[in-house]
Amino acid sequence: FVVVAVFWIAALVGAEYLATRRAHRGTIPSPVVGAARGVAALAFGAVLFQAAQSLQVPAFEPRLLGLWSLGALLQAYLFRGLAPLVIGLLTGGAWVLASTLASATDALSVLQALFAAGIIGASVAVLHHRFVGEGPGRPGGIPTSFAAPWRTVGSGLTLIALFAAAVPQLTSDNYQVSTQLVVILVLAAIAFAAALILCRGRDRWEPLGALVASLIGMVLVLWEAGADPDQVGAADWGHAAFAVASYVLVAGWIAVLGVLRDEDWLTWIATAALVIFTTFQSFAVFAQIIEGAWLFILL
């Protein structure tokens, strides 16, 4: 544990030393600083897991991911490092998924947590554009590039949740509200309200889009269809058609958002999600309705 902790501290101090040299002399390339900060954020996770092992805490405990995320996010905002922010958001998303899956007894609460995390990502992203970007009079502000990781992770979680919500076999049976779900929903409500009140213009459309996607997902889960795979009725037709149309619209919105924000990752993620979703729907849902090559072509 001591060796890992010393390595983490050395990486953290070394990264900021390199950042200081670059700021004053311009001799250290920025990728080196970013890589060093990323190594420090990864090493912090190693410290946590090593400490957990020493204390006989199971390595698969989701709280370790949550602590890792908090530490990486703290480093990112203290030292304005993009690499720690990406690591913090990825581990935070993994914590939301792992912790809800471990504690939930139903599908609806898991999807609600993922949709709420997507709303948080979209809301925090536009708040970065509104207040904390660098510019005249704010040379020490948080870089506007911090908005892109929040938007990307939030959009990814929204697409994953909507993908799962479109599966007819997922229902609201045994629905229970846990303390963790309440906390995530409250945080999402606060971030959403702050984005609507404080942001201006088209920035407001991003959290609204995430909210609309969440509401669509709830409708798909609560809509009971696909109970009998051998008999396809009007409800199954309607559910499948609504799911495909909704996913196309949401994925298209995220792809367009990637163009408007000049963030290629969003467009790539939305395109890949749409292809995977269409393929899955073709063979898992629509196979009982339309057969042959026309199935995929139509979708």
Where are these regions (language model features)?
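Alpha-helical multi-pass membrane segments and their bilayer interfacial helix-loop junctions
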Residues: 1-299
